[in-house]
Amino acid sequence: DISSDGRYVLMMTSRSRLTQRPTTLSTLYKLDVQTLQTETLVAEDGFLGGATFSPDGTQVLLTGSPECLDGIGLNLPEGLIPNQYDYQMYIMNLADKKIAPMTKDFHPSVQQTVWNKVDGQIYFTAENRDYISLYRMNPSNGKIQQLEAKEDLVKSISMADNAPVMAYY
């Protein structure tokens, strides 16, 4: 992802480790394109899925299984292994690198995410039983609201950069 001011790029690398679980480890970096300095945001995590900047560039929205980020998204009894495809959302504050699990107690699996520049809300799709539903989350308090959609399977969403307009199918 590229920050809205164009100065920073989020990039991930991965390496294989076939001798133990997880077998692939990913590292997330923030690159300053003016100085070419990199900063490691997440090192060798086996369950991290993706990352995008907040509209103001002060936070990063991370997605991954409940086991990513040292398991801060886990909500199962000790000894149980969560579904690796049950993607959750986490928000990292770039100033202090603190990470908050935003969907730890949210049961549908997160799929596509869009952090909207106009209203600052995070819009996302999630597997909801046999449906793929549309949701909105307030990143400041974690409140999630299911949005009414005319489709049972919302496969993709897109939002205008400077207007309160969304398209989905």
Task: Please state what every model-predicted region is.
Residues 4-5, 55-56, 117-119, 159-162:
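Residue-level detector of Asp-centered blade-edge/turn motifs that repeat once per structural unit
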Residues 9, 57-60, 121-122, 164-166:
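Hydrophobic beta-strand positions that form the internal "hydrophobic ladder"
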Residues 32-36, 93-97, 138-142:
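Short loop/turn segments that connect beta-strands within beta-propeller blades
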Residues 7, 39, 58, 97, ...:
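Glycine-centered loop/turn positions within well-structured domains
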Residues 1, 12-27, 40-49, 63-90, ...:
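A flexible loop/linker signature enriched in serine peptidases of the S9 family
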Residues 91, 158, 163-165:
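C-terminal structured domain segments across diverse proteins
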